[in-house]
Amino acid sequence: MKTLLILTILAMAITIATANMQADPSGQVQWPQQQPFLQPHQPFSQQPQQIFPQPQQTFPHQPQQQFPQPQQPQQQFLQPRQPFPQQPQQPYPQQPQQPFPQTQQPQQPFPQSKQPQQPFPQPQQPQQSFPQQQPSLIQQSLQQQLNPCKNFLLQQCKPVSLVSSLWSIILPPSDCQVMRQQCCQQLAQIPQQLQCAAIHSVVHSIIMQQEQQEQLQGVQILVPLSQQQQVGQGILVQGQGIIQPQQPAQLEVIRSLVLQTLPTMCNVYVPPYCSTIRAPFASIVASIGGQ
C-alpha cells in the first residue's frame, strides 16, 4: 500500500512538473533559478532571529543576577551599626560618672587646710613689740645723731632766741657756725619720713636736760602725771615742791621754737602736721611710720 501511495505521489509530481514546463517554456530556466534564492532567505531570517534573542536573554540574566547580589554587603554595613551604639553608650556613662563623684572626696581636705591660716595671725604678736622697742631705739639713735643740734640750741647763738634759762654758755660766732653746719649735716642724713620725729627728739632731749638740771638744783621739775597730785592751782610733787602752771606753757614755747628754727636753718622740709603734734615720742614714731 505504501509503495502504491509513493508511486502515485511521484506520478502526480511528475505530471505537475511537466504541465508547468509546457505552459511556459521560457520560464523553465527561471523557475528553478528562483527557487534556490528563496532558500537562502530562510536561513538568513532564521539565523539572525535566533541569535539576537539569545544575547537578549544573556544580558538581562547576567547583570540582573549580579546587581542584586551586591545588595548582600549592604547587610554587612547595617551590622556594624549595632556595635557602635552598643559600645560607646555603655562605657561613657558608666566610667566617667563613677570617678567624678569619687573625686569630690578631696574637697574635704580644703576646709582642713584652713587650719594653717591660724599661724598667720600668730606672727602678728611680735609686731606688737616693735612699737615698744622701736621708738626707744629710734629716739636714742636720733638723739645721738642730732646731739649737735641740741648743743647748738642750748647755746646763745644767733638767730636762735630760746628761753634765757636754757642758755648755758655764750659761744663766739665761729663756734656757732661750726655747730650749725654739723647739725644741718646730721639732719640731712635722716630719712624724710623720720625728720619730724628727729626734730621732736631734739625737743625731748632739751626738756629732759632741763629736768636733770632742775633736779640737781632742787627747783621745780616735770614728772609723770601718775606721780602728781594737784593742790589748788599748782601741782604738788612729793618732797620736791610745787610746779607753777606757767612752766608747761614755757615748755610749749621751747617746742615751737625748735620746730620753727631747725627746718628753716637747715632748709629741711617738714610737713605741716609736725608742728601740731603734742603726743609722746613713741606715738609720733608710730604715726609717722604708718604714713
Swiss-Prot record:
GO molecular function terms attached to this record: nutrient reservoir activity
Pfam families: Gliadin
Region feature (Disordered): 38-137
Domain of life: Eukaryota
Transmembrane segments: none
Pro residues composition-biased segments: 82-99
Leader sequence segment: 1-19
Comp. bias (Low complexity): 38-81, 100-117, 125-137
Keywords: Repeat, Seed storage protein, Signal, Storage protein
Matches recorded under InterPro entries: Bifun_inhib/LTP/seed_sf, Bifunc_inhib/LTP/seed_store, Glia_glutenin
Protein family: Belongs to the gliadin/glutenin family.
Protein purpose: Gliadin is the major seed storage protein in wheat.
Further comment: The gamma-gliadins can be divided into 3 homology classes. Sequence divergence between the classes is due to single-base substitutions and to duplications or deletions within or near direct repeats.
Protein name from the UniProt record: Gamma-gliadin B
Organism listed in the record: Triticum aestivum (Wheat)
